[in-house]
Amino acid sequence: MTLSEYVLKRNGVPLGAKGSLLKNLENSFGAESNVLFWKYWNPIWGFYLSKYIYLPLNRYLPKSISSIVTFGISGAFHDLAIGLLGLGWQNFLTIWFVMMGVFMNISKSLNISYSRFSFFIRAVINISSIAICFFLATLVT
């Protein structure tokens, strides 16, 4: 699958099409579960994480562990970007992203869905899940 095909599958609109960012945000924040939130969030980054990290890890690890490691590597890349900006190495984003990966796996194992709620409530829940993981990461660092 190419990047363009992946983005079209995730967003429902072609890569770079008018309104594609808005569609991505609507899909992500209005997602009916935490798993779906991450399915829709940043499809370009998700394509490369899936292709080069998650899928290769799946050959050797359970999917839940592969996804947590992939979240951690994504966080490490974000920390690296901050370091390259001259702000020093931070490990906060790595920890935060691992927390989000754990949260996603817990919500998946519990089969948590908020499909019966309005878009607004689903967005609040999705944003809250990120905020909760952020708070937990601050306790660890």
Q: Residue ranges of each PLM-predicted region?
A:
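Membrane-interfacial catalytic/cofactor-binding modules of polytopic membrane enzymes
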Residues: 1-74, 116-141
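Active-site His/Glu-centered metal-binding helix of metallohydrolases
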Residues: 76, 80-81
